[in-house]
Amino acid sequence: LDGVIGESTGHSTMVRIGDLEISTRRQNRNPGEKIVVSLGASQIILASSMPQNLSARNIVKGTVAQVWSSDGLVFTQVDAGPKIIVEITENAMTELGVTVGNDVFLVFKSSSVDVFDA
């Protein structure tokens, strides 16, 4: 995902990806610097309602755009501004009622976000 470095405070740096702003570990980069962000599909928790009281710094609302399976795993493409791929189990898909068009929340820690030079 293409992004831009935002402000840093304490131990974190904000990164903007289109209209989406997420928290990462503190970056030794200048605000406005172009970067590439990587977030593993298995590093994201998918929730059907807004989670509360979490240590994870990133909670992003989106809409399920696609659902497909491969080798026993289920993948969802969530439109959260940028399109983000999330890996879940078939049980999770069934229990959460994940279908195209559903609103969901993506939850991930700042430390799960990798930042690279653009």
Task: Indicate where each model-derived feature is located.
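Glycine/charge-rich catalytic "coupling/switch" loops of P-loop NTPases
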Residues: 19-68, 75, 87-118
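Short glycine/proline-enriched coil/turn segments at helix->beta-strand junctions
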Residues: 33, 80-82
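Conserved hydrophobic positions within beta-strands
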Residues: 4-5, 64
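Short, conserved beta-turn/loop elements at beta-strand boundaries and strand-helix junctions
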Residues: 7-13, 67-73
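SH3/SH3-like beta-barrel fold
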Residues: 13-17, 74-79
